[in-house]
């Protein structure tokens, strides 16, 4: 762990919002409906999330705010968001400290922390589904050099500054403290900007929700064909059970699912993709419409349930999480959108207990065998001893002085 590691591997770009950020928002596909009839849903109160106070989790769905969940497989309800950086950090921590194996909390771990760790262990994120241009990560010692490396990397790659590094406890970092950091940043645009609705509308069961929309309903007739061509239906059972994609200029796909089914984003995605297999993919006609709420969220979440968790990792060491947090800034409007998310996990990796260290000191009776490593069947492919090996020399030593001439 003496070497700093900044990573960001060249990968295939996939559907940005579908894979990286998923928000439970509504999409309206309808045939000649009035705006007031098609715009119904539950508002996401982004303003209630406090992005500046890591002392508490500002995102509690039950309180009407937006909850930034830690794992793609975590339970969701109400208003939730998920983005990949925290999972990337967790996966790096597994790979660095526990040979890629699941991080299992010790027996005294609180139930909430254990549940969150289980969800992160189950939610491994495939960075092969992200292009290199979208993300950066670091795994290594937590020190001034690490901070300098991260700040220079994200400035060069994204022209961005960190919103999270100042919130980490650098003063208490010692030689055993590790930092796992990731940033995802991307902007996308629609080749043909959608029309902004001149009036705000309802959402869900609240006709007075005062929600801003964009789409095709208020677009001039000569622009509708190009706007509708950006929208591809995935399935349509009714105006309350439908899904579509919206293509961006950069090739990303915005995936929108109305009345999503499932208890986690993972289940919602799986169910939507299953429905899309047999769905109605006919292009929208000039008499059909699309509309979507504008989105603007800025969230900082500190995962207190993870902090203090201790894990038994490889080589008899222990790993204890000190801090775990994530940010999400996302916008979506008629012209396109942006996503910026950072996550960091700091953890102390303790050395072996001296009493638990193994000592191979042959200072009493011992046997010695010599095996030809080049002969067939004596060693395995990685050079280790085969169970079928045949030694060509064997010694049994009970008095080492007899075996020495000086």
Features from the language model and the residues they span:
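Initiator methionine at the very start of the polypeptide chain
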Residues: 1-2, 62
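N-terminal Sec-pathway targeting helices
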Residues: 5-17
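N-terminal compositionally biased, intrinsically disordered segments and leader/signal-like regions
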Residues: 8-11, 44, 54
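Hydrophobic membrane-insertion alpha-helices, especially the h-region
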Residues: 15-26
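Juxtamembrane cytosolic interface motif at the C-terminal end of transmembrane helices
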Residues: 25-33
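Ser/Thr/Pro/Gly-rich low-complexity linker/stalk segments immediately outside membranes or between
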Residues: 32-50
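Hydrophobic-core positions in well-structured secondary-structure elements of globular domains
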Residues: 50-406
